[in-house]
């Protein structure tokens, strides 16, 4: 069939307008969570974002015990009318150490003491690490893991089936810091909650982005944003408003002007990676230090001194003979466009 030059020109113009508007396929993600307050904000952000396709939610102990976290996740899925998403229970405790919970920061039930209605949703019968393994094999190179709690479930999945590592598209985790901690002087809470699991995950070899305190502490949801959330209403909007209000009030007791959006920011990076700057670094997790257990130790220059042993009449010593390259294993978020993310968060919770 032949087209006239005029018709061809019209078709080209039509397609030039249409094609940029075509939406990319939503990114498939699995959220692994210890459902506390900022987890709640992260989950609702993910469920309200058309860029994301939440394939499963798995629960790990951390902010609250595993049973409470599972109940919280069930109620949130029901509130959002998303019982179609598989929800699975996982580990009941860290790999080696005793569980550390944080009701002080999250309320007695982990959800700012807000009593959500009983859930209509059901728990998936599969164990969380098994569900993660199954979904990665079913959709190779398509699913991004977004763990926003201790990394116990992810480590258990890797230990059970190392072949999942190349099957994951990416892993975007909330955790760690290269500039000091919040659980201790050097350790961030999610990594401190299970350092051995974190070391397994960091050394596994997949594309990994660390969304830590370095950017989370710069991303504060303030009373200005709370006022914006208060302009609209709905089950999810009203719930997140109350959670945010609880966290802001808690932060004000310590002189903070807002609440850090730790977990939601990891979901934000899954939506739009351009909101952060994330140079490549080699990251290890300290598992033995008396004062440094749980620290994420980042090699910013990806090199170590090369020390060579030499023998001398007066004794042996090492001499520095240049540098040895260390392969980076993570993108480490160091800068963030906080206002861009906060505008995104508020608009999505409002259903815009």
Q: Where would I find each of the regions flagged by the language model?
A:
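Bacterial N-terminal signal peptides
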Residues: 9-20
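Active-site histidine-anchored catalytic micro-motif
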Residues: 25-33, 37-75, 109, 115-218, ...
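A residue-level signal for conserved active-site and pocket-lining positions in enzyme catalytic cores
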Residues: 87, 201, 267
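Bacterial N-terminal signal peptides that target proteins for export
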Residues: 1-11
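Conformational coupling and interaction surfaces
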Residues: 25-27, 44-45, 53-54, 192, ...
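Metal-dependent C-N hydrolase catalytic cores
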Residues: 27-29, 70-138, 320, 325-332, ...
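Structural signal for hydrophobic packing residues in well-ordered secondary-structure cores
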Residues: 77-81, 136, 140, 205, ...
């Amino acid at each position: 069939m032949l087209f006239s030059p005029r018709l061809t020109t019209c078709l080209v113009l039509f397609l030039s307008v249409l094609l940029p508007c075509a939406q990319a396929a939503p990114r498939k993600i699995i959220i692994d969570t210890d459902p506390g307050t900022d987890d709640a904000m992260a989950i609702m952000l993910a469920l309200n974002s058309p860029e994301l396709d939440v394939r499963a939610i798995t629960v790990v102990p951390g902010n609250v015990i595993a049973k409470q976290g599972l109940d919280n996740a069930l109620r949130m899925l029901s509130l959002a009318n998303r019982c179609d998403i598989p929800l699975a229970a996982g580990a009941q405790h860290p790999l080696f150490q005793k569980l550390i919970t944080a009701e002080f920061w999250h309320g007695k039930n982990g959800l700012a003491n807000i009593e959500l209605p009983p859930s209509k949703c059901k728990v998936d019968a599969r164990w969380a690490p098994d569900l993660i393994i199954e979904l990665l094999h079913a959709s190779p190179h398509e699913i991004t893991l977004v763990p926003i709690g201790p990394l116990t479930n992810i480590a258990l999945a890797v230990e059970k089936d190392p072949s999942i590592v190349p099957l994951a598209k990416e892993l975007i985790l909330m955790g760690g810091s290269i500039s000091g901690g919040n659980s201790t002087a050097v350790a961030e809470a999610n990594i401190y909650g299970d350092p051995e699991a974190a070391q397994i995950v960091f050394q596994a070899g997949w594309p990994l982005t660390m969304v830590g305190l370095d950017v989370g502490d710069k991303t504060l949801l303030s009373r200005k944003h709370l006022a914006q959330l208060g302009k609209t209403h709905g089950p999810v909007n009203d719930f997140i408003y109350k959670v945010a209000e609880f966290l802001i009030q808690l932060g004000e007791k310590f002189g903070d002007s807002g609440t850090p959006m730790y977990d939601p920011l990891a979901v934000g990076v899954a939506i739009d990676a351009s909101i952060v700057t994330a140079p490549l670094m080699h990251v290890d997790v300290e598992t033995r230090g008396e004062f440094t257990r749980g620290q994420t130790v980042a090699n910013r220059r990806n090199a170590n001194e090369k020390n060579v042993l030499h023998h001398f009449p007066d004794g042996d010593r090492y001499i520095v003979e240049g540098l040895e390259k260390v392969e980076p294993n993570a993108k480490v978020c160091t800068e963030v466009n906080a206002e861009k993310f906060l505008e995104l968060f508020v608009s999505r919770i409002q259903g815009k």
